[in-house]
Structures are given as structure tokens and as C-alpha cells.
Amino acid sequence: MATSAQTLRRKRRYTEEDLKRLPRDGYKYELVNGRIRQAPTDGRHGEIGAGLAARLWNQVRRWAKVYDSSTGFRMHSGNIRSPDVSVLCRERLEGGKSPEDFINGAPDLAVEIISPSERPAEIYAKLGEYFESGAQEVWLIFPERRQAHRYTPSLQVQVLGEGDVLRTPLLPDFELPLTELFEEIQY
């Protein structure tokens, strides 16, 4: 019998196994400090994530894997995080293949698309966990502001606006004008 999200809400402390038993129902789930968090996303969020994942995949598919928000990463803290888009170098995967289980550690690049309802404390807690677990870079995408914030492990941030081009030393050939990322999205 499948475990429902409703049933899990009644428990006090959840485990990785509880998270694995959740149905694939279109929601994004994370295990954070023993609690399961559900974060449904809207169409604009999904469109930006899919567009960014496609652009990244076209650039890195020969030497890295690109994942969507349904992929769980096991942080050093024990939390399971699911970035909206992530890139992981194949050399970090056994045989260069994705495991059937959650992936140990953070992706090399984690991308979070930020909704207006997300609290800054939650956003920066995630940011810290990604870097503590091995991320090389984190991008926070703010669709309503039409901005991207590119963070490095030293927590230096580069704030980019609609007229700017998103680039990273992690992906030397990757360039994404933010105008293209946001062009179809109406607010």
C-alpha cells in the first residue's frame, strides 16, 4: 500500500524511507530536519525550470547530468534537498550513471527558482546546506524581479538583471541572456 502525504503528516519525525514511499503526484517534497515539506509549483515556475534545464542539458550532456526537481540529494546534515534544476559532473557518479537512490552530496550546481512566498531564512538555509554538502555554485532565480543571483562557496554573490547574461566558470561555454529566460513569462 502506498504511503500518502496525508498519512505522513501525522507522524512526528520522518525518515528517508518515508520520503521514498511518497507517491509521484507532481509535488516537490524535501526531508528537512525530520519533517517532510511539500512545495507545489506553479506553471511559470515549471516553465522557467524546464527552459533552464533544457539549455543546461544542451551544453553539458557529454560530461555532466542535469536533473529536475524530482531528484533528491542527500545533504551532509541528513536532509534530502531537491533543487529545481541541478547539474552533477559524471565523474562524481559511479560508472558515470545516475543511482536508483538519492544522490549523496549536493550537485555541483544547484538552481532554486524562488517564489514570493518563500522566506529568506529558508532560502539561505538551503544555500548553506548546498555549499556544506559540496556544491560549487548556487543560482537563485527570482522570476518576479527578473533577476538571477549567482553564489559561490565563499557566499560572494553576483546579482544579474534582465539585460545581463548568466555565465559561470563551471560551464565555460554556457551563456544565457536573462531576457531569454524570462521572455515568455508574464507578471
Where do the PLM segments sit?
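Gly/Pro/Ser/Thr-rich low-complexity, intrinsically disordered segments predominantly at protein N-termini
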Residues: 1-187
